[in-house]
Each structure stands twice: as C-alpha cells, then as structure tokens.
Amino acid sequence: MKKFYLIAVPIVLFAGCGGNGEMTVTEKDGYNIVAQKKGPELGYSPNSGIKLLKARGCIFKDLNRNGRLDIYEDWRKSPEERAKDLSSQLSIDEIAGLMLYSNHQSVPGSDLTQEQERFLREDNLRAVLITSVKDAETAARWNNNMQAFVEGLGHGIPGNTSSDPRNGSNSDMEFNAGAGGKISMWPSSLGMAATFDPQIVYEFGTIASQEYRALGIATALSPQVDIATEPRWWRFSGTFGEDSRLSADMARAYCDGFQTSPQKYALYGAWGTQSVNAMVKHWFGYGAQEGGRDSHFAHGKFAVYPGNNLMEHKIPFTEGAFKLNGGTSSASAVMPIYSILWNQDPEGGNVGGSYSDFVINRQLRQEAGFDGVVCTDWHITYDNTTMDYRGGGKPWGVEDLSVAERHYRVLSCGVDQFGGNNDKGPVIEAYGMWVKDHGEESARARFEESAYRLLINVFRVGLFENPYLDPIESSRIVGNPDFMAHGYDAQLKSVVMLKNHNKTLPIKGHRKVYLPKRHFPATAGIWGGMSREYWDWQIKPETVAPFYDVTDNPAEADFAIVAIKEPSLSMGYSLDDVIAGGNGYIPVSLQYEDYTAVYARDESIAGGDPLESFFNRSYKGKTVKTANRDDMVLVQETRRKMGGKPVIVVLEVGKPVVLSEIEPYADAILVSFEVQNQAIMELISGKHEPSALMPMQLPKDMRTVEEQFEDVAHDMECYTDADGNTYDFAFGMDWSGVIHDERVSKYTR
C-alpha cells in the first residue's frame, strides 16, 4: 500500500529554490519518491541508511551520511562542480572501482547474484553491462535492488547500467498495429544506413533511449561508427556502411537521439532523465581489418592501411559523434579498438588501440579534443592463450607485460575505464606503479581526472537524484504499440530492391506462391560449438498466407519466393589448416561456390605473434567452402522448376555479397537487413513501396575483393546485372525504376 507524507519545510528565499518548502514522500515497493515544488524528484531506499537534508527550502539526499550538504549532493550545482567535489573525496580504492566495467551480466530474476554483490561491495564497481533480461518489469526490479544496495555503500554512488544494442528484429514475429512487444524492433545499423535518412536514426535514438531508461540502462555501448571499408569483415553489419559522410550523419543523429532529453525531462541543458550516454565505438580505423579477420582474436589482431587512408576513419567521430546538434555537444564516451593499427604510429608502436599513446592521447585527446570517458573494449588486459576464439584476452602488442603493467600502460595513454574487468586489484597495482614513477601527487591527480570524467556522465542523467524505476511503468514504456509501429516503419524503409526485371514487383491480387524450404546447415559458431542442421522455411507460410495462397507444387504456383541468407563466412583462420601443416590462415569468401584465393597477396602486410613462429599470414592458393552453398542451389533449382514464371529472391545480408551466382536466376531481388518477414511481404505485395539504397558496394567477383584496399571505401568493381544496373553504393529501385533523388545526390561521389 502506498503511503503519502507532507513535511513542512521553513520558507527561505534562495535562488533556484524557494516556494513554501513543502514536499511529498510516496512509499513505493522498496524505495521512496520525494516530490518537491522547486526541485527534481528524489528517490531513495529507506533501508540504505541515507537521510534527507533540507537547505534553503530545498530537499537533498545525504548520500555520504555526514549530516551536511556536500557540493556533490547539491543538485543546484553543475555536473562538473559535483564531479570535481566527489572525485576529490573518494579514496583510491573507490576510484579504482569506478574504473571497472563489469563482465556481461544476465538478469533472469530481480535479485542480485552473489557475484554482483561482491563486485559492487568489495571492488566498488558501479558500471554494469547487462545482456539478456527476462522482461521490463524484472529489469526494473533488479535495477531497484541494485541501486538500493549501492546507495548504502561509501559515498552512495549509483550504479550505471549499460547495454550493447538490443533493438534488433525477430524475423518471424508478426506486426499488429496497436500491439506491443518485449522491446521495439528496428533494422540493423546497416539497415538504418540503407534508409539514407538520419532522421530515422534520430527517431530510433529518442525511442530506444526511453526504453533503455525504463530498463535502468543509462549508457549505450553504441553506436558502432567504424567505416566498413573491408567488405569481408565480420562486424560489417553493426556499422552504418562504408561511407564516411553517411556514417558521420548517422552517428550524429544516433547520439543526439540517445543523449538529448526533451525539455520536460531536462536537468542540465539537454541532459536529463531521458538521456542515455552514448559510448561511440571504435576509435579508430577498425573497419580496415586485414583479410577481413577480426581483432577479437589473435589471428585478426591487425588493421592495415595499404591505401594510406587511416585519417578518413576518424570522420564519423570528429564530424559526427563529436559535433552534435541536440545540445549535449558530443558523445559522452568512446571505446577504442582492439586492433593494432599496423605501422601507423610515427614512433613505431604496434600495439592495440587502448595501449597506444598515438591513438588515445595524440589522436583522440589532443587532435580531436575529446575530454569525455574513454573505456577499453572488453578483456584487453587478460592473457591470450590461443590463436582462435578460445584465446581469452586481447593484449595485442603487450603480451609480454603483466596484467597490472597492462593496466598501467592503458592509464598512461589517457584511458579511464577497463571493459570486462571486475577486479580492482590490478588497478590498485597500477596506481602503485604510477606513484613509483611519478610520485603520489601525480598519481592521485591522474586517478581523480578519470573519476571526474566518469562521474560527470552519472550526474548528467540524474541518477544521483533518482535511480529508481516503477516496474509497472517500465512495462508500459518498453515495446509499447507506438514504439513498435515506428520500428516497423523503419524496417519497411530499410529494404533495398536491387532488381525488378520487367516490373515483376509488386505482385498484387489473389495469387498462388511456391515457397521452398531452405537448408539450414550445421555451422561452427564464432565462439565455438555447432548449430543444428535442419530444413525449414526462411519465411514461414503463416507469414505469407495473409497475402497469397501457399503451395508446395511449383506447377500450381503463379510465382516463387526464395528466401536465403548471405554466404556464411569463415573467420579467416582454421585449426584444421594448422594440423595439415599450413599457417592456419584461410580466405574469407563472399560467394557461395567454393573459393580459391588465386589473387590474394603473396605476403601479408602485417604479422607476428608470440604464439606463432612466422610473419607471413598469406592464404594465397587456399580453398574454402561456404557452409550455406545450398542457398545458391535453391535459387537455381527454383528457377528450373518455375520455368518462365517469376522468381523473387529475398536475401538477408550483413555485408557485401558476390551476386553473380544468384542474380541471373532471379526476376526480382530484395535485400533485407534483419527485419521482420512481414515487412518483406508488404513490399512484395505492393502495400508499401521500396525506397532504400545500398549502404555499400556489391563486388563483381572475389578478385576485386582481394585487390581492393582494406582501408579505402568505394574501391571495388561492382556487379552489373542482366538489366544493365550496377550495384554500387547508393543504388536502389522503387516501382518506377532506379532511384535518383536528393539522397543519392548528397552521398554519391
């Protein structure tokens, strides 16, 4: 039962407060809410031991329980003033805790785990990365339990929960206007880029930020704004494509949407209770991975720049995420790359991004003028033990240093926080190393500098005043019908029509469609394990049935829909090749047929690892098979079965694809980027018209893929189809033909 209290506070005239001093306290489930006429709403747990302070007609939380109003407790002060005061009060142990960012934490229930209680209490950790949550109500209750727990510790610093992107689409889920879901569903970042409309990305940010805050999330580990200049790269789908100008505009819109609170919710300028800190990543040059291999693994630790084009990779940051329009000025945090920028440091330091003074201090802090939080990517200080996914850590270039020495080097480069580190011990050791080298005063100043940056981001979003959530309200906000409708509309606008021979689409009226099953092969997971092999529909018959009659007999059908996925790529490394006497390095293929790397480099640009006795990582002459080759076979067989009747190919992608094996057999091709299949059907049936454009080039063949430069965009020979259309960046079609609008004019070179 809710209880309400009225407490009379003497009237004292004071700038920023005043009024009659009356406040209302509402008792909730495990926490209280304080409403005051001339100040922000306060939330606190009656079990945490903190009290309320009354000063000049205003109410404050006595977070350190010392009976007086400290500057950091005074919401009338700026975040900068408050962060400076609190950072000066904290012990080195407490600051070391702020420098930690937890390992991935799932939230299956509302109670804290023993591990969570331990790192919150003993290690003073306050930045928690959550992954899966049961539902919005459970997430809100977990948040409240976590906030009540830390509120009673030390200086009462609230938890700052974060998340990787969590608004992807479930392809089989049906969209019903007026119906809600677990969370609003949007196309992938690459799909957002395919709209070529930053306003859609801004709208996504404003909606996702509300959902994040309702889940207790105040920091987004996004956007990923690397320009994907290497077409084989595993993480291509998480980017806004290969173009630096488009990526910059999308990055700006994304950060503005997430960080800007509407005036009603603003606390400090545009910062407020609907703001979510954007941690833009990855500074910088990550999209140039040699051979497409990824630096999560030792075999992909190098990014290379044969086109001498490293500095273009800064543009989405310096011209986008660091130049916002919404009032928060800049993305509040940055995550550097894992990769070694091969031979790019003028002083010769081939080390991972967070270990590089060139990358952080010189390029980010000095050249770009960024003074916000810098947080390492996850597990860079851990040891690495193998060349494949089992290795563990990512200490690229500093494998010979101890864990504590790695922490010290990272701090020396200007980094503030360690992703995936729950243990304050190595940070304390690094402090001791700094004291030994530079003295206690310098070490204390360096730690306070990071504490100041980290705390500003917590003050700006109002967590010190009220970190608590109403679980029922959270359930109402997350995935509400309006948010779902906006996400679905973005999905419709993200699907590219590549081919429409003889105006095959749209197909209107009562027709019969042949819908063949797809082979889902058993494939190795990125982190190990094998998927199950089976046959099923990529687009379910029940999704198609509202639009057409479905048949399994091609002879009866008026047309066919063949839904497939892009070629399943290898990671560019194989233990089987090592066992067979090779160096382990294999091609990454973008085609369905077996691929032999005839045109690969004789000598790799980069190389060397403590676990290898050689430098050259070339895979020239080696052959790889594509696990889902049957997708190509399915298209070709369907063409044969259908004779001259239309065959529509629906291709889900997350990176460029060689289409020479598919396009000649299709009358129409739709390219999707992780959308609901219902959206595909609404386009095929003509309920909506396609409007998206390709955010990347589609290569003619694998030779042009091998011969392009990893660091340069728009440098491949593109595929030209049977109708004479070339699948270049910004190509797309609507019912009238090839699109030539202001978006194409703005972004094509």
Predicted regions and their residues:
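Generic cytosolic/nucleocytoplasmic N-terminal low-complexity/intrinsically disordered segments
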Residues: 1-2, 19
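A periodicity- and composition-biased signal for non-globular, repetitive helical segments
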Residues: 8-9, 287
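Glycoside hydrolase catalytic-domain context in secreted enzymes
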Residues: 16-749
